Amino acid sequence: MVVKRKRIRLFIKPYCGWCHKAVHWLDEQGVAYEKIDVIADETAYDEMIRLSGQDLAPVLDVDGKILADFGPEQLADFWKKLEK
């Protein structure tokens, strides 16, 4: 599954079950991405809110295309749309 993008960032909270599932899904697909812990980095937390309009995680940023507060099925659908 190849999506050619400049920047893929996943904003997570370490205790978030959906975040762990998103990490697992991206890792299984062999996606290179930056994992950002918004609890450890207040600036990243503020950026996540600015990008998504909410404070819920996970938030995926693929070259400015944002998927927020999602589960594995929504992630798979989002990824398919990116491949087109």
Task: Specify the residue positions occupied by each region the protein language model found.
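Local sequence-structure signature of Cys/Sec-based thiol-disulfide redox active-site neighborhoods
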Residues: 1-29
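ATP/adenylate-binding site constellation spanning eukaryotic-like Ser/Thr protein kinases
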Residues: 13, 53, 72
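Glycine-/small-residue-rich active-site loops that bind phosphorylated ligands and cofactors
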Residues: 17, 40, 67
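Short alpha-helical
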Residues: 17, 43, 74
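Thiol-based oxidoreductase modules, predominantly thioredoxin-like and allied folds used
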Residues: 32-45, 55
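Structural micro-motif
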Residues: 52-60
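Non-catalytic, surface beta->alpha helical segment in thiol-disulfide oxidoreductase systems
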Residues: 62-84
